A protein has these predicted regions:
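Internal alpha-helical scaffold of NAD(P)-dependent oxidoreductase catalytic cores
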Residues: 78-80, 98-133, 143-175
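Catalytic or ion-coupling anion/metal-binding cores of large enzyme and transporter domains
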Residues: 9, 33, 53
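Hydrophobic/aromatic beta-strand patches that form the interior of the parallel beta-sheet core
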Residues: 15-17, 33, 61, 85-87, ...
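Rossmann-fold NAD(P)-binding glycine/threonine-rich loop
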Residues: 39-119
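Residues immediately C-terminal
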Residues: 34, 38
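Conserved N-terminal Rossmann-fold NAD(P) cofactor-binding segment
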Residues: 1-30, 40-41, 45
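Glycine-rich beta-alpha junction loops
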Residues: 18, 65-67, 89-92, 132-135, ...
Length: 175
């Protein structure tokens, strides 16, 4: 019963929309988390639109999994840059506790602290601070772990199912 109530409450907080017809509905937001296609041109175009409608205090975070902040911020004002950072969620978001945050060179301490507090205290995430390098830290380390696991699987003659049974839920990875 509580799950049904929680789902109903959540559905009132989330409204589906698109960037062409519904962007104006974001004009009073304090935090916008962008999660669109991983293309610099698309992100820059969206940030141009957001900068025109958001209040000056609004924080904009990108959920990019590896695009550089420097490139995403080309053409943005200093005010926008100080309220911008990366919030890299790991999938599946509802199960993965990790949230990698990445500051840009102009990101203010106030913005960084507010997003860290929000991620930790409101979303219940474990926060790590990454660097503005290609694919940040989580993906760069994760791919090496994945390749080592595949190598060990092949070397030991294990099946993918064997590896999943060892490295999946027993090690707190979602199944």
């Amino acid at each position: 019963h509580f799950e049904t109530l929680a789902a109903a409450a959540h559905s009132r907080l989330v409204t589906a929309g698109n960037t062409e017809d519904d962007l104006a509905s974001l004009s009073t937001c304090d935090l916008v988390i962008e999660a669109i296609i991983e293309r610099i041109d698309a992100k820059q175009a969206l940030f141009t639109k957001l900068e025109a409608i958001l209040p000056p205090h609004a924080i904009v975070a990108s959920n990019t999994s590896g695009l550089r902040i420097k490139e995403m911020m080309e053409g943005r004002t200093e005010a926008f840059k100080k309220n911008f950072l990366v919030m890299h969620f790991f999938n599946p978001v509802r199960y993965m506790k990790l949230l990698e945050l990445v500051r840009g060179p102009e990101t203010s301490d106030e913005t960084a602290n507010a997003v860290e507090t929000f991620g930790r205290d409101i979303l219940g995430k474990g926060i790590v601070w990454g660097k503005d390098t290609p694919n940040f830290v989580g993906n760069r380390i994760g791919v090496h772990g994945m390749m080592a696991t595949i190598g060990a699987m092949l070397e030991m003659g294990l099946s993918p199912e064997d590896v999943d049974n060892i490295t999946g839920k027993p090690m707190a990875h979602p199944g």
